[in-house]
Amino acid sequence: GLPVGGYTAWLERMAADDRIEVRLDTDWFDVRDDLRRQSPAAPVVYTGPLDRYFDYVEGRLGWRTLDFELEVLDTGDFQGTPVMNYNDPDVPYTRIHEFRHFHPERDYPSDKTVIMREYSRSAAADDEPYYPINTETDRALLSAYRARARQETAAARVLFGGRLGTYQYLDMHMAIASALNMY
């Protein structure tokens, strides 16, 4: 299930802790040397693409990305569920989200609903990666990157997490469990 108030409220409460510094529009690779000099023993949780962390030294891992299409429909309920997945070869999108069903306790207009379609495609170098690709080539690269990640964790206290940092498909409950198990 969802946290009370949704993930945004949950993350806002965590980020409000005085021990947490939040930097927006900041690329880790632009600030990491300064941050490591300031706090060399501090652990780092890296959740970006695993291959990018190591400057693609083993090669580029394959990723899928998503394009989104938002639409307001003139109906009070489009699909009766928060997310409907589609794997039919003749359907161009992979899923449809209908946001009103994530929080049924809230009041919504009875004559309108908002949906979002997700379209999956191979990620180009400048796209935001979302999902790992499980090919033989990617598995070989991943093995080499995981060996590097283990060394980096031991030497520099860098913890690799999330879908991108572990190159794993993770549902939210799996990502949360993985983060809790890091410590």
Could you say what each language-model-derived stretch is?
Residues 15-29:
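A conserved beta-strand/loop element that lines the FAD pocket in flavoprotein oxidoreductases
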Residues 22-24, 46, 160:
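A structural signal for the hydrophobic beta-strands that form the central parallel beta-sheet
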Residues 152-168, 175-178:
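Short FAD-binding loop at a beta-strand-to-alpha-helix junction that anchors the flavin cofactor
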Residues 22-23, 55, 166-168:
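Domain-scale detector for complete catalytic domains at protein termini or as standalone homologs
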Residues 1-13, 23:
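Short beta-strand to alpha-helix junction loop
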Residues 26-148:
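Mid-domain catalytic core of redox enzymes
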Residues 18, 40-42, 155-156:
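Short, well-ordered alpha-helix to beta-strand connector turns
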